[in-house]
Amino acid sequence: MSQASGRAIDADLAQSDPDIAAFINQERQRQETHLELIASENFASRAVMQAQGSVLTNKYAEGLPSKRYYGGCEHVDAIEELAIERAKQLFGAAWANVQPHSGAQANFAVFLALLQPGDTIMGLDLSHGGHLTHGSPVNVSGKWFNVVQYGVDKETQRLDMEAIRQLALEHKPKLIVCGYSAYPRTIDFAAFRAIADEVGAYLLADMAHIAGLVAAGVHPSPVPHCDVVTTTTHKTLRGPRGGLILCRDAEFAKKFDKAVFPGSQGGPLEHVIAAKAVAFGEALQPSFKAYSQQVVANAAALAEQLIARGIDVVSGGTDNHVVLLDLRSIGMTGKVADLLVSDVHITANKNTVPFDPESPFVTSGLRFGTAALTTRGFDSQAFREVADVIADRLFNPEDDAIRQRCLDRVGALCERFPLYADSKHKQPVLV
């Protein structure tokens, strides 16, 4: 018998920890048999998952490529350098840092590099579609800085750039944040640049939700207009869960590098960075542009059909992957609607809408996104059918027969558009 036989590190997960293996396979089954409409979620490729589940998880590599504090980094250096080059090529940036563990970490590093506690920042109100890290009082960004929040116009539910300009002129922020978590319309980055220049502010674009659309050229890019751009690497970009910082200025780049390490993080996650590199490579392919165009077309189809069925959509439609329902039009809360669609295997999230009278735990909205199901192959016609299932369920919450029909239609759609190639064979995938 060899010395290697029977070692704990050689056991498969199913042998080593059957409980965790079972939970993973249950989650795999849930993803296969439910319609994923959470706007911040997507399905990573098998290649991305293989990179993330590799031996790279064993390697510590504090510092930057060729400037590490540990030995044995020659291979992770090559991987990280490739991830950086692909990110720069994908977004037309002069510099990239691929080490942030998340979008929130990327934003925090930018704040650390450019701001001092007590400085004034401007960001979109969370209830109007902003993000926690853009100055919400429950987040460190809202505790360390003087926050001025702008909102959308009450009638159009779109950004009013002149109102934002007047607010900036009044408060003279040191940094303005644009880019959002629940704003379904195109962002005018050039207009934000003009405002930032007028008041002498830095301009940060958080494109976490639209990064894939930007990469594919189906949404305007913030990179030419902003001092710094942050993003996650999942969502519409379809990579692993992680963060990324981009900029055009070499002096800023040095500050951001130091703000990531040693300023706010220790060792980078090289297995995740490898998965980011794979995802960036996928996004550089022509097929990714076609995918992103379909994401936007599918969102338009979903919004149009829901409106046709009598449900209001915030701003009257969408220009990106997000469709935000205003359920006040049907006398329902987001909390109730979320439970109703979840009960027929549609996964979404309750969400505040502009000028929402309900609390964030109840809300008047339901947020959908089309990136994940588009990855499964759903087209516009399939999304119209999804809209009908949603409407049937919301308008008939007590009808068991309609509930069952909704479940049947969801099941049929999942069979028609399997998640991974082996989904129909029910093979467990632990990568």
Curated annotation (Swiss-Prot):
Cell compartment(s), UniProt: Cytoplasm
Catalytic activities: (6R)-5,10-methylene-5,6,7,8-tetrahydrofolate + glycine + H2O = (6S)-5,6,7,8-tetrahydrofolate + L-serine
Annotated site (Plays an important role in substrate specificity): 234
Binding site residues for (6S)-5,6,7,8-tetrahydrofolate: 126, 130-132, 359-361
UniProt source species: Synechococcus sp. (strain CC9605)
PANTHER family, per the entry: SERINE HYDROXYMETHYLTRANSFERASE (PTHR11680), SERINE HYDROXYMETHYLTRANSFERASE 1 (PTHR11680:SF35)
Gene: glyA
N6-(pyridoxal phosphate)lysine modification, residue list: 235
This protein's name: Serine hydroxymethyltransferase
EC number in record: 2.1.2.1
Database matches in InterPro entries: PyrdxlP-dep_Trfase, PyrdxlP-dep_Trfase_major, PyrdxlP-dep_Trfase_small, Ser_HO-MeTrfase, Ser_HO-MeTrfase-like, Ser_HO-MeTrfase_PLP_BS, SHMT-like_dom
PROSITE patterns attached to this UniProt entry: SHMT
Subunit comment: Homodimer.
